[in-house]
């Protein structure tokens, strides 16, 4: 990590007292790697959350909550279900949100929880063999590394421990029928913003520095060949520390990422406490800390059959509009 990037993270840590007043991909079980295109046992027709019902109720509830109006219009593209939350690091206040409590399947975003849980259960220096799993999982969104750590940590117990510790109310383990699929963890934009706030103000320095340091060094090309520089990396100026997530675009990208210039399943919608999680439509998420000012979480369900390129363009525009509206 460069000195400037380290300085940025230290700057974030410097404003933590102010927060006290306010303020990934898919899982691949070790036994086999699920194929999103051939696993017919899990190919139920997806239900579209956000078209009404729970999403409509959330929209009405959020409309009643006082949040500063963005400076400019932030429009969710047609056919996309989006939940987002932007938190001002200095004041700790949520400055923009939309369907922030709507549940999405996490894809690789859950890898943050996997890493934090590991680091908090294992005190002291990280052994080289475990660092060889944690670092590529955080920087390159490596699925095999995540699966190894997921199984070692007790699978869904990782999510339950983190939910209790951080106070996450919409986050839940994968469905009982799919315990190995960490990418089926349910998350919300509000909960993921809480995760970043936990890292910034409550986590031990060694945990904060390890996780945010690696997210600050996220590679352009993910381990599976997808280009993970969409959303925040393309929409806002550096420095940033990011964790992206994608699912539903196949195991191999149509155009492999190059530094010079994932697997998913479809099992329809599962109702979790009246807040349905859609496991069918593609998801594309961008999350992270922007400089020493903002936490941004944008979770999206894309139209069925959407290409990765078009989805990335939509998420990038949404992240850019959102950033400009609060910058």
Regions found by a protein language model. Give the residues of each.
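A mature extracytoplasmic/lumenal domain signature
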Residues: 88-90, 108-110, 122, 141, ...
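Glycine/small-residue-rich loop that forms an oxyanion/phosphate-binding "nest" at active or ligand-binding sites
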Residues: 147, 151
């Amino acid at each position: 990590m460069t000195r400037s990037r380290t300085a940025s993270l230290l700057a974030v840590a410097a404003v933590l007292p102010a927060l006290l007043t306010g303020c990934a991909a898919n899982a691949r079980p070790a036994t086999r790697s699920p194929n999103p295109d051939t696993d017919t046992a899990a190919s139920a027709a997806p239900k579209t959350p956000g078209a009404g019902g729970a999403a409509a109720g959330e929209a009405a509830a959020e409309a009643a909550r006082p949040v500063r109006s963005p400076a400019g219009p932030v429009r969710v593209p047609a056919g996309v279900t989006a939940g987002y939350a932007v938190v001002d690091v200095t004041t700790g206040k949520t400055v923009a949100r939309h369907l922030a409590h709507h549940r999405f399947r996490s894809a690789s975003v859950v890898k943050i929880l996997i890493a934090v849980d590991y680091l908090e259960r294992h005190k002291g220096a990280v052994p080289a063999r475990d660092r060889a799993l944690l670092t590529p999982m955080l920087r390159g969104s490596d699925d095999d590394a995540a699966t190894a750590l997921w199984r070692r940590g007790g699978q869904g117990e990782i999510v339950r421990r983190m939910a209790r510790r951080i106070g996450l109310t919409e986050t839940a383990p994968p469905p009982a029928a799919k315990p190995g699929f960490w990418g089926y963890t349910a998350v919300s934009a509000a909960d993921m913003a809480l995760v970043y706030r936990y890292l910034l103000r409550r986590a031990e320095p060694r945990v904060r520095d390890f996780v945010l340091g690696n997210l600050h060094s996220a590679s352009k090309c993910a381990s599976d060949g997808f280009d993970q520089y969409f959303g925040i990396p393309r929409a806002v100026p550096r420095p940033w520390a990011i964790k992206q997530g994608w699912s539903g675009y196949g195991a191999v990208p149509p155009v492999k990422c190059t530094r010079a210039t994932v697997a998913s399943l479809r099992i329809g919608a599962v109702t979790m406490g009246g807040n349905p999680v859609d496991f069918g439509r593609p998801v594309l998420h961008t999350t992270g800390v922007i400089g020493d000012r903002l936490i941004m979480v944008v979770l999206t369900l894309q139209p069925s059959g959407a290409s990765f390129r078009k989805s990335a363009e939509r998420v990038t525009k949404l992240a850019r509009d959102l950033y400009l509206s609060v910058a």
